[in-house]
Structures are given as C-alpha cells and as structure tokens.
Regions:
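Membrane-proximal basic amphipathic "stem/tether" segments
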Residues: 1-39, 43-44
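Intrinsic-disorder-associated interaction segments
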Residues: 1-5, 9, 13-16, 48, ...
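Phosphate-binding glycine-rich loops and adjacent basic patches that engage nucleotide phosphates
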Residues: 13-23, 125-134, 164-169, 203-209
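Intrinsically disordered, low-complexity N-terminal regions enriched in serine/proline/glycine
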Residues: 20, 68-69, 96, 165, ...
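Short boundary motifs at domain starts and secondary-structure transition points
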Residues: 23-34, 149, 207-213, 245
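A short, charged/proline- and glycine-enriched loop
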Residues: 30-39, 114, 214-217, 250
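Active-site and donor-binding regions of nucleotide-sugar-utilizing enzymes
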Residues: 37-197
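Conserved catalytic-core segment of nucleotide-activated headgroup transferases in glycan assembly
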Residues: 47-55, 188-258
C-alpha cells in the first residue's frame, strides 16, 4: 500500500473514531431507551455463529426483540467504517448489545446508562495469546495502536468458561486487576454438549467415520495456528509414536487442525 493511500486511511479512521462515531451515538442515544431491544453484533461471520445461536433462541422465547447486525469486519477496504456508522446508530437506544470478537468500535464512545454490553467471545478457554498479550510479537498490533483505538473498555460483562481463564482475558483486554467484568459463568456454545441427543448423534457420527473408535477412549489433538494469518503454521511437536507406546491399543487419536 502506498504511503499516500495509507495516510488517507489513517486520517479517515481517526476522523470516524474520534469524531463521527461519538457524535452519531450521542444523537442516537437521545431516543428513548428500548430495554427489550437486543442487538447481536456478529463481527466477522456472515451467519449467526454458535457462540450466539443458543442465546439468540433463548432470548426470543422471553419476549425480547433480538436483531442481528453483520459487521463483516474481515472484509478489505474502508467499507467497514460505514458499517460501523450504521451499527453505532442502531446501538443508541438498545437495552443490550452482544458481540463475540474484538471490535474497536466498542471503545470509540461511552455507552449510555441502561445499555448492557456483553462480550461472549468466539472460543472456549484461552488456548492462545491475543490482544495486549502479543504486542511484542510480529503478528500483534502495537500497544500504542491498541490504546489509541481501544476495543474492550465498555464491557458490562465478558463470559468465560472457567475461573482459570479470567486472568488471560483481563491481560489480553488490558484490564486493571480490579476490573470484575470478566466472569466465569460459562460459554453458550458448550450448551450443545449438555443435550443427550446431541451427544448420541456425535458418537454415532464418530463411529461411522472412525469405526476403530468404538469401545475405546478418544484423544483429540486440535492445535491452533500461530503467526501472521497468511504465514500461519501449526506446531508439529506431537510425538504420535510415543503416544502409541504409552497409551496402548485402548486409545484412538483424532487430529483436527484449526
């Protein structure tokens, strides 16, 4: 990208985040608060993902008004600035907004009193570093950039799977030790496993595709990638031979890469 083009992009971003979005939200929030209005901000996907789906279905049964807004944050160009503008206006009078990924729009202004901002995150646990935990690495953003356009300052609640994860999320989000918005109340996407019919179907599908797994213990190896997305690599340090020698024939190893 040329220096001039990058300068234009940077200037446009500053104008929108520091001027246009705060003003738009201020005007939008003059409208009466609709406590039963809920917005699901799907940051990257073009469909409702599993971290949202169960919450969405439950909310519908409670007489609330759930709406889904697809941000498509992973598309190139500067179109996201206009999509952010529309979302900013929509959030001006909502009772609750949920998001499932990093989105720096949520740090561009202070939400009105009465609006809850809930981060459900898109993955379970904390199996890799992100956010402010990787500012010293080649594929991480600089701390200066993260602080200039903060993404996590407005959360009322961030749901995580266990107490052991809390410190990792607080570090990645740049939270002070006294910030208690990260709570281990569970992750909605794992509700799937608490329905017996889903477990039965999962085992049936497993045995269909891997007959040798029947009547055996199953070990799943599911490594995530590290590095820049376009140069990502998967760790290949798993010693399958050693596993076989130590676990014996009563185990089956399944490999599912990110």
């Amino acid at each position: 990208m040329s220096g001039l083009k990058q300068a234009v992009r940077n200037t446009a971003k500053i104008i929108m985040f520091k001027g246009v979005y705060p003003l738009c939200y201020k005007v939008s929030s003059l409208r009466p608060l609709r406590k039963n209005k809920v917005i699901f901000a799907e940051i990257r996907s073009g469909t409702l993902t599993d971290s949202f789906r169960y919450i969405y279905e439950e909310i519908k049964t409670r007489g609330l008004d759930p709406q889904v807004y697809y941000v498509h944050n992973n598309k190139g160009g500067m179109g996201y600035l206009l999509r952010y503008l529309k979302l900013t206006w929509l959030m001006g009078n909502v009772g609750c907004v949920l998001l499932n990924d990093t989105c720096n729009l949520f740090g561009a202004f202070k939400f009105r009193k009465g609006t809850k901002v809930i981060q459900t995150w898109h993955s379970c646990g904390a199996f890799k570093k992100w956010g402010e935990s990787i500012t010293d690495l080649s594929f991480g953003e600089s701390l200066e950039e993260l602080r200039k356009f903060p993404a996590h300052t407005s959360y009322t609640l961030c749901t995580v799977s266990s107490k052991e994860c809390i410190w990792a999320f607080k570090e990645a989000f740049g939270f002070d030790i006294d910030n208690n918005s990260v709570q281990a109340i569970g992750v909605s996407r794992t509700d799937f496993f608490f329905k017996e019919e889903n477990r039965v179907k999962a085992f049936e599908n497993l045995y269909k595709n891997c007959p040798n797994a029947q009547y055996k213990k199953v070990l799943l190896y599911a490594p995530t990638y590290r590095g820049d997305a376009d140069k990502a690599y998967i760790p290949e340090k798993l010693d399958i031979k050693a596993l076989k020698e130590n676990f014996g024939s009563e185990w089956v190893l399944l490999v599912k890469r990110h």
